[in-house]
Amino acid sequence: MNLKLGIVGWPLTKTYSPLIHKLLGEFLGINLEYQKVPIENLDRQKIQDINSKFDGYNITVPHKNKIIELIENTDGYLPDHHVKELGICNTIKLVDNNIYAFNTDIEGINKTLESIYTKINNKNILILGSGGSSKTIEYLFEEHNTVQIASREPNLDSISYNEINDIAPKIDILINTTPIGMPPFEEESLNIPFNQFNNLEVFFNLGYNVKE
């Protein structure tokens, strides 16, 4: 099997996705080519060009929402139920002129936390950041848990970072979805009162620091 895959996002200066997929292809015995496709401003023409060259691709920041706007009215567009409900997509599969759209973040996050908890119920969860990943996590856990989001621009659905002090002692799971620690924010740190999280069971960082 020969597959040409890629990752679409910006800036993609220090992503490990090509290396990870190279190793995965070797492990599975698949002849797999995986390329970085750095695009700052995504539009329909660029998506058409990508679709003509690849068998599938991942979408990362800042395009997980934008991609849906650009392909949802295209013939052959087939989103999974998570993409339909959330409007957030991180994986495209191209087969026989059909565009299959998936949100695999949901399964990845769920499996990671279920390696710690058998069931994630009745937990107080605080999510740092209010982007696409934050909405995915809220969607995943809000039915059986208390989920709050901290945002630099708080609204009716989120709190400000200054309010974290008030709820920190009650939080069981803290999840960072901000780009802090990732390019180009490697030298920045989360300005939150870690010493106030007296009952914290898990700190889950969705990003990775290249130095680590």
Report the location of each language-model feature.
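NAD(P)-binding Rossmann-fold cofactor-contacting core
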Residues: E143-S160
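Glycine-rich adenosine-cofactor-binding loop
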Residues: G9, A101-I106, L113-E143, S151
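A short helix->loop->beta-strand "cap" motif at the edges of active sites that frequently abuts
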Residues: L94-V95, H144-T146, N198-E201
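Residues in the short beta-alpha loop(s) of Rossmann-like NAD(P)-binding domains
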Residues: P11, E153-N155, N209
